[in-house]
Amino acid sequence: MLSRRNWLLAASLAAAAPMTGLSRLQPAARPGRTEPGFRIKDIRRTTVALPYRPVPARNMARELPHWVYSEICEVELANGTVGFGETMLYYTWGATSDEDVNFANGKNAAAIMWNDELGAGLQMACFDAVARAIDVPIHALLGKQAHTRTPVAWWDIDLPPEDVAGYTAFKTKGRPWFDIWEQAKQGNAAAPKGFSITFDYNDTLLDAERGIPILKAVEQYPISKMVETPIPQGDILGNQRIRRETKSAVAMHYGNPSPVVAIRQRVCDGFVVGGGANRVMTAGRIAGMADMPFWLQLVGSSITGAWSRQFGAVLSHASWPAVTCFQLYAAQPTKQNVEVRNGFTPIPNAPGLGVELDWKVINQYKVPKPPARPEPERLLETRWPDGRKLYIGSNGNVNYMLRKFMKPSNLPYFEPGVTCHLLMNDGSKDWRDLYQRARRRPVLTR
């Protein structure tokens, strides 16, 4: 027989499982629902290319050089209030299209702001405008405040060991083309007490049989307290085995497998939650009902960092450090940066997002919107101590290197001593020939 608590949980999970169309079912925000002053009078969009800081720059260049591009969206209401938001153009749960702008123009911002189909920047700007118009922080529109500060983590893509040393807390990648044992060792040697590194494997451990020995080796270091997606999330039995046989908490992206399966089958310890406002609030409440922690993963500059804090204010189980990636950038488009102390950032109570745009910075880094995702030619060389070399070239796909290691293949698995770097284009015929071969298929030599 189901207990009352389990029955309520099951019923809520069943109701939340079909995420498609939830934005249309979500009640519109009440403040100003019929007030003409909340009508959207104008929508303006500005593209910027924010420069990376030095360490992220040399590592993001391998697979994610396009993360520098963001679009700032401003929404002006009939009452004169202006709100703003941000879309990271080439890494987002939803980009704001011209069709979305045409749909929103003339509409009541309070009536449409829960519609995740607006895309990141436009939805964020609608919330910001409505909250500013009624002089409250966005979190007052989301629910009752549960926290006055929220945890936040540094994030960067896969790094060689020497770039790990010296950081205080961050989430990074575990990859077959870097020495995971040395990454953990050097990170641990530089870490102060209480420091932790979360390695996101993005499926690359492939299965529990091969992955568990690596996870056990890494978790011997005190800095290793959590892992993300060590093997494919749909491998229920494999993930259950990892949880049984290792100590580190396992985080999975919410929605795969379905929340019903993930919670009932205990395939993870908590979630990674992202997406639009409606999806984030739904996922956060389901996780709270299941008493499972999660981190918010809403990625962008300091604008998105401020947006993430609003959800961290009201979601009780957003207790794992949030990933927003504002730390990657040498310049921020807001006058106020995200202040982080001892792993936490305070939640502002100023109206809207609680930050203001810095037009000096925006105008400095303003660029024409690219017609498509920029795709510079990149050739990666991976080396092993025994002399093997692997060459993989960019081929128009995001994560062109990662994709080749996410499924079983004849490519090398995790090994000690491996390292990877960009092989710069020296203009030679040899480089061009190798690149053309490596972009078609991996080239492994001895």
Give short role names for the model-derived ranges.
Residues 4-27:
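N-terminal export signals
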Residues 61-66, 114:
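Short Gly/Pro-enriched turn/cap motifs at secondary-structure boundaries
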Residues 140-246:
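Metal-dependent enolase-superfamily TIM-barrel catalytic cores that perform enediolate-based chemistry
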